[in-house]
């Protein structure tokens, strides 16, 4: 057999799928004719079929070496290089093939694939269309490729912020392939970004009609429902997406956002955990989980999340702000200030950043520094109610009560339902002696927020100062309904009850206060005083002993205990306590009271 016979044998074996036999025959042909370019070419094609691309390339190299104008050898070598991921060299080979044979339609198609792999969609589309113009027979097979190229170019344009160009490309993709579910879904995403929610929903619905298992379409429709505040439908779609694809990190993340919005914080954290398990570098998931943890007062956990986010991307200005707030909640004010500094270095015109730093400065007593920050925030945004409110707090701390009133008034004008601003303005008015104005502000604060405990407490204190004891008791009672574990509230209500001579009621409240916090000497003293007025002298004595144990230099307590001892007939102990009180008055320089107590002691000694 000659070389031609072996070549024909190889060709026939190839047609029958007998690839190894074909390779053997072509090899025999090459041995008989070492310059048999077609034999190298065909042996290279079989190597490509068998995915032995390196051997294929070696065969095509030899064929081209023998015949530099062998267009299909360049074409097939290009395809082998494409499958090895060497797209640039593949394109170079297609260029050579087309220079030799401009009508080689397959080479345009394959070069288009290489451009597609390099995300050069413009050139890919041009090559695909050129393929159809040369060979209408390839049109049916290539329409999907053209649609894919337009679709991917649309995705790339969207990533660059060219939403209109992206929509045009998705529409073009759908003209080439009307059943392209992903193109509908991605066009729906753009409609959603542009606020066209109904168009977005229609596109996602169409995508799911075409492909009921397209997890991305459920996810994207869920995002549209979320934007429309239809949270139940959003969660249902995320659930469906995750049923189809349990490893869909974005679906966990976005479901977490919805659950967080619905205040289902533990479930939200679980979803963010899953998202991060699947995508450990998702900075946004760390941020959102940190925000939820802050809401749950897990500030250390929140800080750990913010740390990780900033480790991935140190230029996230807002995350420094989030971490600053968490640090401030933990009392780490200096670190909070440092984070606010970093935020403001990255974004010097973020008014809220100055407010956050001001809050930390207030916490360390730097009220003047805080005011400077609030001033700067208001230069940037003169409608920032939080800045007026915070500056009002700082001014009150510096005893600039008129300034505090002005700032809270500005905050209220910007936010008429800002209950805390009414409360703080009431505080400043009370400190200026305008008790009735203060009460009016507390009334308004409670009208807006009936659970604002500070307003009840401060209104009660103001009413107590005005000797409106019954009203004060009512307000303290309201405060205690909100927080029944406040010793101070019981103590102050007891004082009001004492003032209206309800000594039994006062004793009950002092007892509650002592049960919550037994360290407060005044409660022991005041309960002892109440017992004394009820002539329950033994109980009074026990309480006064406790008071003096906690505060051993308390003149009034010694005088009261002396009186109790006298009522119990223990003159010796009464005289001893009066002597102690006289000694304390003398040390204080209060000679008048000292002399009065000495006279009283002399009278007792004569009895």
Regions found by a protein language model. Give the residues of each.
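Alpha-helical tetratricopeptide repeat
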Residues: 1-607
């Amino acid at each position: 057999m000659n070389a031609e016979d072996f070549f024909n044998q190889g060709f026939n074996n190839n047609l029958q799928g007998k690839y190894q036999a074909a390779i053997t025959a072509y090899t025999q042909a090459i041995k008989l004719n070492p310059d048999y370019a077609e034999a190298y070419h065909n042996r290279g094609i079989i190597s490509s079929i068998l995915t032995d691309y390196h051997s294929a390339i070696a065969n095509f190299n030899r064929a081209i070496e023998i015949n530099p104008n062998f267009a299909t050898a360049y074409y097939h070598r290009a395809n082998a290089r494409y499958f090895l991921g060497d797209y640039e060299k593949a394109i170079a080979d297609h260029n050579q093939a087309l220079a030799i044979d401009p009508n080689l339609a397959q080479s345009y198609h394959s070069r288009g694939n290489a451009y597609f792999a390099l995300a050069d969609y413009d050139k890919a589309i041009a090559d695909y269309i050129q393929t159809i113009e040369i060979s209408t027979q390839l049109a049916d097979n290539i329409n999907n490729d053209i649609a894919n190229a337009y679709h991917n170019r649309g995705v790339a344009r969207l990533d660059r912020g060219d939403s209109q160009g992206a929509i045009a490309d998705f529409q073009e993709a759908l003209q080439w392939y009307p059943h392209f579910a992903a193109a509908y879904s991605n066009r729906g995403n753009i409609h959603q970004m542009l606020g066209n929610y109904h168009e977005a929903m229609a596109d996602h619905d169409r995508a799911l009609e075409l492909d009921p298992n397209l997890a991305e379409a459920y996810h994207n429709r869920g995002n549209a429902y979320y934007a429309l505040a239809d949270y139940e439908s959003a969660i249902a779609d995320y659930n469906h997406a995750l049923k189809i694809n349990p490893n869909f990190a974005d679906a966990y993340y976005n479901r977490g956002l919805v659950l967080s919005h619905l205040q289902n914080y533990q479930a939200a954290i679980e979803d963010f955990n899953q998202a991060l398990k699947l995508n450990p570098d998702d900075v946004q998931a760390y941020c959102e989980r940190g925000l939820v943890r802050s809401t749950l007062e897990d500030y250390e956990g929140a800080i750990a999340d913010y740390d990780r986010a900033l480790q991935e991307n140190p230029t996230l200005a807002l995350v420094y702000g989030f971490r600053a707030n968490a640090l401030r909640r933990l009392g780490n004010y200096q670190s909070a200030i440092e984070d606010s500094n970093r935020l403001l270095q990255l974004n010097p015109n973020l008014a809220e950043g100055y407010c956050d730093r001001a809050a930390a400065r207030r916490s360390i007593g730097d009220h003047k520094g805080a005011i400077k920050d609030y001033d700067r925030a208001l230069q940037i945004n003169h409608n920032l109610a939080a800045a007026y409110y915070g500056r009002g707090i700082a001014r009150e701390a510096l005893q600039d009560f008129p300034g505090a009133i002005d700032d809270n008034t500005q905050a209220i004008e910007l936010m008429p339902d800002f209950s805390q601003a009414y409360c703080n303005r009431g505080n400043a008015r009370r400190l200026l002696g305008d008790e009735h104005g203060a009460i009016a502000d507390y009334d308004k604060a409670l009208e807006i927020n009936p659970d604002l405990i500070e307003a009840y407490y401060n209104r009660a204190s103001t009413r107590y100062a005005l000797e409106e004891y019954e009203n004060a008791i009512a307000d303290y009672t309201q405060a205690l309904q909100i927080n029944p574990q406040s010793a101070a509230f019981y103590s102050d209500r007891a004082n009001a009850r004492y003032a209206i001579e309800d000594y039994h009621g006062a004793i009950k409240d002092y007892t509650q206060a002592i049960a919550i916090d037994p360290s407060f000497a005044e409660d022991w003293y005041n309960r002892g005083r109440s017992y004394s007025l009820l002539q329950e002298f033994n109980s009074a004595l026990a309480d006064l002993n406790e008071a003096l144990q906690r505060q051993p230099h308390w003149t009034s307590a010694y005088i009261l205990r002396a009186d109790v001892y006298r009522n119990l007939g223990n003159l010796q102990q009464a005289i001893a306590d009066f002597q102690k009180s006289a000694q304390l008055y003398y040390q204080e320089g209060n000679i008048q009271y000292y002399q009065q107590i000495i006279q009283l002691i002399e009278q007792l000694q004569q009895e």
